[in-house]
């Protein structure tokens, strides 16, 4: 079973801080002229921190899972399935942070009651979820094919 390392926890905390920074920056931009400049810099900083922490967490996870043998591939697929909901949550929050930036810049104050950023981030997350699920189903299909090849080679040997 795959366990998170302390590095992943640190990047998860950085990720939450990045998204929090981006959303607070958006509210600073709306609040007024004095805080708008601070908010303008907080939003991209939060988005960059969020994306870097997600990429680092995925990289740490991929290095921790062995994929050299069939058993390693099986463990990798199982742990990737476990990480799927975390990656979807990460994608949701990153998309929300990115759309917060677009909302703050493109949407005027007259229509700020409707949160366009949430709608767009939902669409982005659905697209990302479809790609992630397709990737997981392809890995599961490859695992079944590898197991079948292994059983056939064992039959041929004996």
Language-model-detected regions and their locations in the chain:
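Juxtamembrane/interfacial segments around transmembrane helices
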Residues: 62-70, 91-99, 139-151
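Short membrane-interface loop/juxtamembrane segments of multi-pass integral membrane proteins
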Residues: 67-88
């Amino acid at each position: 079973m795959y366990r998170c390392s302390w590095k992943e926890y640190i990047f998860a905390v950085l990720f939450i801080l990045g998204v929090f920074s981006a959303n607070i920056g958006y509210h600073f931009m709306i609040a007024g002229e004095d805080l708008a400049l601070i908010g303008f810099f907080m939003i991209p900083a939060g988005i960059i921190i969020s994306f870097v922490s997600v990429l680092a967490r995925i990289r740490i996870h991929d290095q921790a899972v062995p994929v050299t043998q069939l058993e390693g591939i099986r463990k990798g697929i199982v742990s990737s399935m476990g990480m799927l909901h975390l990656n979807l949550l990460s994608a949701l929050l990153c998309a929300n942070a990115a759309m917060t930036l677009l909302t703050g810049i493109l949407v005027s104050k007259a229509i700020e009651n409707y949160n366009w950023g949430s709608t767009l981030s939902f669409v982005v997350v659905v697209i990302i979820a479809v790609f992630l699920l397709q990737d997981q189903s392809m890995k599961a299909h490859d695992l079944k094919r590898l197991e079948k090849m292994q059983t056939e080679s064992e039959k041929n040997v004996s």
